[in-house]
Amino acid sequence: MNVNNLVIEALRPCNLPVSPDFYDGDDDEYITFNYANEYPTNFGDNVPENDYSQLQIHYFARGKNPQSKRREIRKLLFKAGFDVSLGPINYESDTKKYHCVLEAGIDSVTNLEE
């Protein structure tokens, strides 16, 4: 299962650019995400049936309070089946943007047959 597509589709209602790893545009608001960890779960006959993917979701916003969009992102990810916890909100003085971090995780089917 491609977790990247799950994240992008889940966050589509935000109407913001969503990109894995980095964003190379010039929008004042955008979302990036990266894999923090991935490990096998639910073993049967010594073979994992699932992978648990842990991701960091980064929401960047310039010139506005990030709280409401941060809550929206959390709701959308949760609705899509992710476990979600809220991380810190930092202000980056060099870019003049708020940087919000959310931690998300999801179980997906391991397809070792492919």
Spans of model-derived segments:
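Long, contiguous binding/interaction regions
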Residues: M1-Q54, F60-E114
